[in-house]
């Protein structure tokens, strides 16, 4: 792709992006509606979560394919509208879950598809930080983002886990969210102090997800949590034949000749490709050649619905049951 148009509410930022990434004659806009009048093939939606659906739908309605940053949308209703428009217009809609393209994720996904883990009945999806609250942009603004670490990082962890299990049939969701440290300052945050008055999202969130086949997922996410390690990202899968743990590398637990064995695949051979580059190549071929997407919008829709259910459960104190 050649990037020939940029849009930002602040013209200076759009101009800087043009100078960094654009063609010499790229145009700059402050209103996405004007940009969509251009003869474009693709639009990248990298805006606050509250506008993902609005901009993506307008782009597809005007004949453009869309690459939308995660999370898909702020709400399930918005995400569902995006999928419906993609189906109606026939435009490609890709959601930015680039973690799927990591070497360890690709290896483990193949093992899951080959049945090496058997029936996966328990999983843990972890994306936690002790003190790494993003203090820039609108990350702390619930109206613009829809939430905090759950919708920011937990969305990656949940997407990875559902994809590995190849199970999107959710029965129920129970969740808890906390805002226990948001009113504190001088806490050693990685990116400096935040303004407690502007911290309107949760600082940690947890979910218990039960699938229709009985499988269970535990989801944990945080920006600020008094844990021992500084951060952690983990996908733990437990199956009837084997188990796997993606945390600081990949380990697979198997039984060989009656003995428990831990396998650590060598994923360092050759030059591993950047997951972002793989994502762009797959998106390009989906647009240019009609190739199949790895991240299906229908899958991202389920992720969005589960995240929304965690917030709803946390607010009502009740388990949320899916149809």
Regions found by a protein language model. Give the residues of each.
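N-terminal Rossmann-like dinucleotide-binding module
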Residues: 1-22
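Active-site loop of classical SDR/Rossmann-like NAD(P)-dependent oxidoreductases
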Residues: 12, 246, 270-281
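C-terminal helix-rich "cap/oligomerization" subdomain common to oxidoreductases
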Residues: 20, 42-44, 80, 88, ...
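Conserved SAM-binding strand-loop segment of SAM-dependent methyltransferases
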Residues: 25-32
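Beta-strand-loop-alpha-helix segment that lines the small-molecule cofactor/substrate pocket
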Residues: 40-42, 48-49, 53-100, 115
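Predominantly a Rossmann-like dinucleotide-binding segment in NAD(P)-dependent oxidoreductases
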Residues: 99-199, 317
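Contiguous beta-strand/loop segments that form the cofactor/metal-binding neighborhood of enzyme cores
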Residues: 159-251, 280-292
């Amino acid at each position: 792709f050649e990037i020939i148009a940029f849009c930002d509410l602040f013209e200076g930022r759009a101009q800087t992006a043009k100078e960094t990434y654009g063609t010499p004659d790229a145009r700059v806009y402050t209103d996405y509606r004007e940009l969509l009048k251009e003869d474009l093939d693709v639009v990248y939606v990298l805006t606050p979560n509250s506008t993902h659906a609005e901009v993506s739908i307008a782009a597809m309605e005007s004949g453009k394919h869309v690459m939308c940053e995660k999370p898909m949308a702020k709400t399930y209703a918005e995400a569902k509208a995006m999928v419906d428009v993609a189906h109606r217009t026939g435009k490609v809609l890709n959601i930015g879950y680039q973690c799927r393209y990591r070497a360890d994720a690709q290896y483990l996904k193949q093992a899951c598809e080959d049945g090496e883990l058997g029936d996966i009945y328990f999983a843990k999806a972890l994306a936690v930080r002790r003190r790494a609250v993003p203090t820039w942009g609108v990350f702390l603004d619930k109206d613009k983002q829809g939430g905090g670490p759950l919708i920011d990082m937990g969305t990656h962890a949940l997407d990875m886990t559902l994809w590995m299990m190849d199970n999107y049939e959710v029965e129920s969701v129970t969740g808890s969210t906390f805002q226990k440290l948001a009113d504190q300052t001088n806490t050693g945050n990685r990116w400096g102090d935040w303004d407690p008055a502007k911290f309107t999202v949760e600082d940690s969130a947890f979910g218990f997800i039960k699938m229709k086949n009985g499988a269970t997922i535990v989801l944990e996410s945080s920006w600020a949590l008094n844990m021992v390690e500084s951060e952690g990202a983990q996908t733990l899968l437990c199956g009837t034949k084997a188990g796997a743990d993606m945390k600081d590398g990949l380990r697979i637990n198997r039984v060989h000749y009656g003995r428990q064995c831990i396998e650590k695949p060598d994923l360092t051979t050759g030059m591993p490709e950047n997951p972002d580059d793989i994502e762009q190549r797959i998106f390009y071929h989906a647009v240019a050649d009609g190739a199949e997407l790895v991240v299906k919008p229908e899958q991202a829709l389920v992720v969005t619905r589960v995240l929304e259910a965690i917030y709803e459960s946390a607010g009502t104190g009740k388990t949320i049951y899916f149809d």
